[in-house]
A protein has these predicted regions:
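Active-site neighborhoods and metal-handling regions in enzymes and metal-associated proteins
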Residues: 1-96
Length: 96
């Protein structure tokens, strides 16, 4: 889990936003919207096929606001399947 978090942090660092990422990366969900598996620093529980997790990096700017764009991802035997299909590019989001 911490490897996934590291990839997200590296992307935010490249964009100059690493200090604005102050929340966990995501969590598992199923019967409950927030279940026990967390994606974040220091989380080492392995993902298993059949798990569904959120990947929702958030960027927050004090006094201004913030944004989280969430993907729901099914963990499969061969990798993953992104279950959401929402726009992520600014021009797509603003035009939606």
């Amino acid at each position: 889990m911490s490897q996934i978090d590291a990839v997200a942090r590296k992307a935010l660092e490249k964009a100059g936003l690493e200090k604005r990422f102050t929340h966990g990366l995501g969590h598992s969900f199923g019967l409950e919207i927030h279940e026990s598996v967390r994606l974040g620093k220091g989380q080492e529980r392995p993902l298993e096929a059949g798990m569904v997790v959120t990947v929702e990096p958030g960027v927050y700017i004090p006094g201004f606001g913030g944004v989280r764009i969430e993907d729901d991802v099914l963990v499969t035997d061969s990798g993953n399947q992104v279950l959401t299909s929402l726009a992520k590019q600014w021009d797509e989001v603003l035009g939606a």
